[in-house]
Design a protein with these regions (language model features):
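Short, structured beta-strand segments at or near domain termini in extracellular proteins/domains
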Residues: 104-116
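Short coil/turn motifs at beta-sheet boundaries
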Residues: 35, 102-104
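Functional-site microenvironments in short loops/helix caps that host divalent-cation chemistry
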Residues: 1-96
Length: 116
């Protein structure tokens, strides 16, 4: 459910208790994933390269799906931001979508590459 395990711990992530502002990367080391990824819960949700398609997961591979080649003109946004309304929406697996031109304070991005 969460990068650190299945039990919710408010002290492991930025959920806006310090004035609803993003914080320096790595400020919540207890919340790091087992892979060493920082800040996967709280702070801001993140844009993904994947296009959104409402039926994609009906026929996708179970392991490491790459996302549809084309979609509805919307991109995927993942992860719960500090503005989430409940703990369920703070999970890394939360999947939303938006227009690529959308901008707001609850969505950012993360630079990443394949480990191979």
């Amino acid at each position: 459910r969460f990068p650190w395990g299945n039990v919710w711990e408010i002290k492991f992530c930025n959920v806006g208790t310090d004035g609803n502002l993003p914080v320096t990367v790595g400020s919540f080391e207890e919340g790091n994933s087992v892979y060493g990824c920082y800040d996967m819960t709280g702070s801001v949700s993140e844009w993904c390269e994947d296009w959104y398609h409402p039926e994609y997961y009906l026929s996708t591979p179970k392991k490491n799906p790459k996302g549809p080649i084309k979609g509805t003109g919307k991109r995927i946004i993942r992860g719960g931001s500090m503005f989430a309304q409940n703990v369920y929406k703070l999970r890394c697996a939360v999947r939303m979508f938006g227009e690529p031109s959308d901008r707001n304070k609850s969505v950012g991005f993360r630079c990443a590459k394949d480990a191979e």
